[in-house]
Amino acid sequence: MKSGEFFTVEQLKKHRVIAITDIILQEVSTPEVDDVIRISDDSGRGSGKIEHEHMKPALCILAAGIGSRLENFSEHINKGLLPLNNQAIISHLIDKTPEDYDVIMVLGYKSEMVKEYCKIAHPDRNFIFVTVDNYEGKETGPGYSISQAKKHLQRPFIWVTADTVVTDDFPPADYNWLGLYPTSIPELYSTVNVKGGSVIDFKNKSKDGYDYAFIGLAGVYDYETFWKQLVGDEIVSAYYDVDKY
């Protein structure tokens, strides 16, 4: 920055005042500033620009599958277009993110129908459509689907399956988080062990699982770690080693 220039730190972005002397040192989140000297950073980050703080986050909706568990309900329509309160499910998901987020739609089954709907229902949003070459049978699933959009997700992002329904707005993609819901049947779901608000273990469809089920919604801040951990068609494989995050 040059002499006389300034920037505004948005509310809640300032963490604390470090010291007040002739010079005021403040800890702030400043993606507007390229040249930063970090003194005693809590996360051990070095000085200088942090690339992903300058990237526009994205919302990735996984809508490639045929929706077989819905049986006749998805016979003629993509499951993400099924109505909920007079609006398609994917519209509820899109509306829960800031308008400047890119929306990456990973498509397969009834893909053209979904494209047409998105363009008409959300003309002000920037969509990137990714078509999955294989969305039925073996070696398919959300892990495989999201891998097809990898080049568009080299930045913090939120991913969600097209049939996920939540009532609250999504948290921002400026930290790693998972969407959870209580369950008494862990053998049917991927479940997590939560301690002090943090995930300390993850099990996939085990009778020895935990009390909170993963609902197919997550915020990915450490996207490089996510891609390194992801294996095969099971997207939850990216979270088996939670200590990596």
Residue locations for each model-derived region?
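Short acidic-glycine-tyrosine-enriched beta hairpin
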Residues: M1-R16
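Active-site metal-binding loops of divalent metal-dependent hydrolases
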Residues: K13, I66, D163-T164
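Double-stranded beta-helix
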Residues: R16-M55
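Short beta-strand/turn micro-motifs composed of small residues
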Residues: S29, A63, L107, T161, ...
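Conserved N-terminal catalytic core of the sugar/cofactor nucleotidyltransferase
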Residues: M55-I61, R69, P83, Q87-P156
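Short beta-strand-to-loop acidic/aromatic patch adjacent to the donor-nucleotide binding site
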Residues: R155-V165
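Conserved core of the sugar-phosphate nucleotidyltransferase
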Residues: V166-S237
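An accessory alpha-helical subdomain
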Residues: S237-K244
